[in-house]
Amino acid sequence: MRVGFIGLGSQGGPMAHAIVDGGFPTTLWARRPESLEPYAGTGATFAESPAALAEASDVVCLCVVGDDDVRGLAYGEDGLLEHMSSGDTLVIHSTIHPDTCREVGEKAAAKGISVVDAPVSGGAPAVEAKQLLVMA
């Protein structure tokens, strides 16, 4: 399984590290290139765009701030859904409005892409202790 991860902040960063450390082939993308620096030498690869990340991944994880960020990444220029394949899965770890998740899910389903609404709780310490609560 090839994993793509977007959202390398205080919550998503440790999650992405855990995926990389778990040995999964992982592709990362960040709006701010400096967010990728902690992953140099880890085995993770870096995508030039969300579209490139989508094409390199079977599962794409989003851990971004909110509804507008999720929509922008899903449908915007270089949008994930346009470049993901049927059978792929989009996992939304962001805390977003249920209507946003339904909207993304409907558009994804039309392309054969699954969406999992999986917000997380516990922060970086829980990730590092491998005790992150995922509400799926």
Q: Which role fits each region the language model picked out?
A:
Residues A47-D99:
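Rossmann-like NAD(P)-binding element
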